[in-house]
Amino acid sequence: MTTEAVKTRRKASLATPTGLGADAVRDISGALTILLADMFALYLKTKNFHWHVSGPHFRDYHLLLDEQGDQIFAATDPIAERVRKIGGTTLRSIGQINRQQRVLDNDAEYVTPLDMLAELRDDNLQLIAHMREVHDLCDEHGDVASASLLENWIDEAERRTWFLYEATRRTGG
């Protein structure tokens, strides 16, 4: 395919039938695409920590992080499909994820298990705040379906945060 053909295809309108206006499609699909980048970044960080956790609570943390990683990954396809369903375009590459993600990577050679859990807890809290902002945007544009999906993802992220908090909480005093 020629460069000119690629440029022409990029300019082609989707014209997906939806009850949302052009501004709503632009705003919501843009916000959901950034959320999707965050979800992929959080998924990989969660799996990174799942693979590299060690210590006396290895089994519990390893299984917890595996479960949480699966849950995060399970949300990625519905997010991307929602963007497409309303007439937008979404992520196309790892490079695009890297440019848009707000969740910070952790490439450290060693991270203590409690630091792993605390970092993921904070990342999930950040994700919840971003999802609430996107929910408000959906409400402003009357996109009930996207708002409804976000409510479920917020609930899942709150549960992940709760588990991570409880796993790092010190007992006593």
Spans of model-derived segments:
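Acidic/histidine-rich alpha-helical segments that form the ligand environment
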Residues: E81, G95-N152
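Amphipathic alpha-helix face/heptad-repeat signature
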Residues: I28-D38, L42, Q68, M116, ...
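Amphipathic alpha-helical coiled-coil segments
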Residues: A75-A80, R160-T168
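Disorder-to-helix initiation segments
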Residues: S13-L35, P113
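Acidic, low-complexity proline/glycine-rich segments
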Residues: M1-T18
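Long, contiguous binding/interaction regions
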Residues: T2-T3, F58, D70, I94-N98, ...
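Helix-loop segments that flank and shape redox-cofactor active sites
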Residues: L20-D27, L42-E67, E133-A145
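Conserved alpha-helical segments that form or flank metal/cofactor-binding pockets of metalloenzymes
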Residues: V53, H57-Q96
